[in-house]
Amino acid sequence: MNPLPDAFRNTALAHRALHDDLRPENSLAAAEAALAAGYGMEVDLQPSSDGVAMVFHDATLARMTGRDGRVRDFTAVELSQIQLGESEAGIPTLSDLLSLVAGRVPLLLELKDQRGGQGGSDGVLEAGTLKALEGYDGPVALMSFNPAMVEVLAEMGSAWPLGLTTCDFR
């Protein structure tokens, strides 16, 4: 098991980056604001139809974009052109975020459950996430509510710390 980097213990994390009415959640503008404030970030990942890890919370586009459809039904290029809220920014890829952050603050990446009910995993989001992280030099940890996704990450040989997110645990 890979230990959690010390940076996670010493840095506050902005949930979905530092967002507000002008900077949509999980956007590069929200990430820039978190960086400027000295915060690390927790962001959410969904897969595109071509297997790219996209920085987006919901499985569907409606709440954040006003568009119909599931994130996983669009390519990364198509998603990058879909406007987030009232901003002019499109949905960023994980690679976009990593380029912006460049190892300066810790990133906690939540891989969103793709099957519902924490069922199995097809491995698409896990593979896209690990591909984006290849060669990245900065503090990162990966987590999911779906234990199967955490298991797939481990089986794929993730060099990053892995965690299981939970709630109402008794």
Question: For each predicted feature, which ranges?
Answer:
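Phosphate-group recognition and catalysis centered on beta-loop-alpha active-site segments
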Residues: 1-170
